[in-house]
Regions:
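Short C-terminal tail/terminal secondary-structure segment
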Residues: 24, 160-161, 172-185
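Substrate-binding pocket helix/loop in short-chain dehydrogenase/reductase
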Residues: 28-44, 141
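Alpha-helical segment proximal to the catalytic Tyr-Lys
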Residues: 60, 105-109, 169
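A glycine/serine/threonine-rich, flexible loop-to-helix segment
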Residues: 26, 30, 83-85, 109, ...
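A short, exposed helix-loop element centered on a Lys and neighboring polar residues
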Residues: 55-56, 101
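Short, small/polar-rich loop/turn modules that mediate ligand/substrate recognition or access, typified
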Residues: 12, 108, 113, 171-173
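Catalytic loop of short-chain dehydrogenase/reductase
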Residues: 70-95, 100-109, 122
C-alpha cells in the first residue's frame, strides 16, 4: 500500500495499471539442478508473482476509481513457440493469463476491468540474444506469422490504449493478441 500511496501522491488518482515486467533465461531444464531451480524461482517471482504483488498493492485505488488493469501476457500463454529451454517462462505467462481471467471475474462487481495483451515476437531486449544468436528460430517464428515480421514495441501501444480506455468499457477477462496473426494459423 505504501507504493500505491506514494504513486498517488506523485501522479494523482490511479485508475490504470499496466503490469509489464518480465525476464527469461534459456538455461536447459535438464541442466544443473541448482541453476534450473534458481531460474524457475526468479522467473515465476518476477513474471507472475510480480503481477500479483503490484496488482494487490494498487487494489484499493483501482477499486476507488473503477480502474483498468492491463497485464502483459505472451504468445507463450497459449502455445510453445519452439524457443528452447523455456518451461518457466511459458508457465509464468500461462499464470498471467489465468490470473487475468480470475481477477476479472472477482473485480468486475467493483467496476474494475482486467484484461491482458498477448504479444508475439516483439523486438525487445528480452529476446535480443535469441534474435542475434538464433536467426533460424526467428525465421521459423516469422514464417508462421501471417504479417511476416516481428513486432515492434509500438505495436503493443494500440491494444494497451484500447484496453485502458473507455472504448473497451464492456471488455474484461479478455486477451488481445498482438502476434501478427501467429495463432491464426
Amino acid at each position: 500500500m505504501a507504493v500505491a500511496r506514494s504513486v498517488g501522491e506523485r501522479v494523482g488518482r490511479v485508475s490504470i495499471l499496466v503490469n509489464n515486467a518480465g525476464i527469461n533465461r534459456r538455461n536447459a531444464f535438464t541442466g544443473d539442478a541448482a541453476a534450473v531451480i534458481k531460474d524457475w524461482e526468479d522467473i515465476i517471482s518476477i513474471n507472475l508473482n510480480g503481477v500479483f504483488n503490484v496488482t494487490h498493492a494498487f487494489l484499493e485505488p483501482l477499486r476507488a476509481t473503477k480502474g483498468r488493469i492491463v497485464n502483459i501476457a505472451s504468445i507463450q500463454s497459449f502455445v510453445h513457440v519452439r524457443t528452447p529451454n523455456s518451461p518457466a517462462y511459458t508457465t509464468s505467462k500461462h499464470g498471467v493469463l489465468g490470473f487475468t481471467r480470475a481477477l476479472a471475474a472477482e473485480l468486475g462487481k467493483f467496476g474494475v476491468r482486467v484484461n491482458a495483451i498477448g504479444p508475439g515476437l516483439i523486438e525487445t531486449p528480452l529476446n535480443a540474444a535469441v534474435r542475434a544468436n538464433s536467426p533460424e528460430l526467428v525465421k521459423i517464428f516469422i514464417d508462421h506469422t501471417p504479417l511476416g515480421r516481428a513486432g515492434k514495441p509500438e505495436d503493443i501501444v494500440g491494444p494497451a490504449i484500447f484496453l485502458a480506455s473507455d472504448l473497451s468499457a464492456y471488455v474484461t477477462g479478455s486477451i488481445v493478441m498482438a502476434d501478427g496473426g501467429y495463432r491464426a494459423i
